[in-house]
Every structure is written in structure tokens, then in C-alpha cells.
Amino acid sequence: MAQTDLAIVIPAYKGTFLRETLESVARQTDRRFHLYIGDDCSPHGLNEIVKDFEGRIPMTYHRFDTNLGGTDLVAQWERCIALTQGEPWIWLFSDDDVMGPECVREFYEVPEDVRKNAVIHFNINIINDKSTVIKRPAEYPAQISAEEYLYLKLNGKIISYVVEFIFPRAIYDHIGGFVNFDLAWGSDFMTWLRMATESERGIMTVKPTEKAMVNWRMSTENISPNKTYAIEKRKIESLIGNAAYIRALLKQYPKHYDGVEKEFRFVKFPFGEILRNRNLFTLKEIHEFTEHYRKHVGFTTHAIVCELYILISKYLLRHER
């Protein structure tokens, strides 16, 4: 087996935690990987941080002339993956998360014939800006199908982030790269779902040990906590796109999703975001969301119920005042 079967790819922009991320890569007990860093025209002097790891990590550093992640994050992911040299497996990581020292070793412990036909997953811890573990989410089952992944994810039984999956290049090429939504909101979820659908073995989680987990950082620099009007509006539009994508996938692969194909609740999740942020939007905007949902997803009942609930709550709120 070649020494560079695994490409670890970091689309980099922020410098705050990059050194800690690279330290975690440098500490890998199994060196059968090559690291690719795609500097998204960052103003934060990333090259100076990266220089300190020359000779410690087998890597390629490339600084792009233009910033792309600010307008199309998925396109930035993909141009960084394009830096790779044909490695059969790709691990898209980040510039602020941390991998356990035995992650690469445990990846190679999965038999090659299994790896070729599965998306490989690591369990995670959630850490804060001080790198303290603040939460340990539920572990994944050892193996789950695309249908089980969808069921567990949308029922809140599991969570997932982009950095906890290693995927075969062959499947990545087959599906045409990442599913692209504005802000990359749900892009990783939809992509893992599609990859699991295309994989004979679905999603397989490596043996859960403390040294083979990924620490995902809940940082003030992430998009997730941003509750501004503009960001929330874009998130909701992307969530409606996510729901439409799931509906299309269920129709395209009915045998893969036989147990959930008729469960309408699997595509009503955009309304949770609308309800949580209803005070940010006018009734006209909420109506536009529901119309968009009806047009692209269907299931008029969900849209009507959501709109009526918000209309009544706003009416009651006005009269309470």
C-alpha cells in the first residue's frame, strides 16, 4: 500500500487555532497521509504558522490569490481538494478543530475492502475556545445505512460535522463533489447522506477510543451562532433546499429509504428554524418562506400549520401589549 493513500485537506482562513490543529496532525502515530493546506487568501499570516511544521508533517501548502470561502465555502472546499494528488481517500478537516493522535491509525485498521465501500466516521467531542471538552455527543453505531443516518440525524439522536468523515475519492467523483448550499448550510449533511446512499456499507465508525476521536470546536468565529437577520434568512433558504434535496433523494432511491419515504416529518425541519426566529421576520417574509417550501418540497399541510401558528402567536403578542 502506498504511503499516501490518505489526503488530509484543510481549507484555511482563520489563524486563531491553526497551530493547535497542525499540532494534532503532527502527533499522528501513523504517518501514512499527506496534508494539503489551501490558504483562502487569508490576511492572518497563515504561512508563518505553517512554516513551523515543515519537516514535521508531509504537506503541501498553497496560497490562493483570491478569497473564495467568503462567497462560496463549498467551492473553496473543492478547490482545496483539487490540490490533492489522487489519494484514494480524502479527509476534509478544518483550521480550528483537533484530531486525536490515533485517528489515522484507526482509519487504516479498517480493512481496505471495507473502506472502499463505506464512508468512514469518527466520534467527536465538542470543545470551546479554550480547548476544554464541554460536551460528548452520542456515539454512532458501528455501521449505519443511509436511511438510518437520516432517521437518527433528523430525530436529533446524532449530530455530524464536516470534519468527522473520511470518504473514498471514487464516491466523491461519482456524485460530482459536495452538494452546494448557500453558507454551506447542510452541505456536509446532504453530501454524507448521498455518499452513504451510494456506498454498499453506508457509514462505518472507527473503534471509539479517546485517542481516535475528533474535537470539534464551538467557537465564536463559527457561522452557527450567528443570529443576524441576513444570516438567518440565508440559513432558512438553505434548509428549504436541504429538505427539497432529501425529497428528491427519497424518490430517486426508494429501495434505500423504504422505511422513511412516506414520513413527511423528515422534511419539515426548516419550519423549526422559522419558528425559532419568527420575531426576525415579517409575516410577508414568513409567507414567502412557506411558499418557497410548497413549491420546492411540497407537503402543503406543514407550510399552512407553520404559517398559521406564527400568525396567531404574533396576533396574541400584539394584543397582550
PLM segments and residue spans:
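Membrane-interface aromatic/basic loop that binds lipid-linked glycans or pyrophosphate carriers
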Residues: 1, 264-321
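Conserved nucleotide-sugar donor-binding catalytic segment
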Residues: 8, 145-230
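Short, well-formed alpha-helical segments that are part of the catalytic scaffolds
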Residues: 14-27
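Glycine-rich, basic loop-to-helix element that forms the pyrophosphate-binding segment
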Residues: 65-85
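Short beta-strand-to-loop acidic/aromatic patch adjacent to the donor-nucleotide binding site
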Residues: 87-98
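Conserved donor NDP-sugar-binding/catalytic core segment of glycosyltransferases
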Residues: 102-135
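Catalytic core of nucleotide-sugar-dependent glycosyltransferases
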Residues: 189, 211-220, 225-257, 281-294
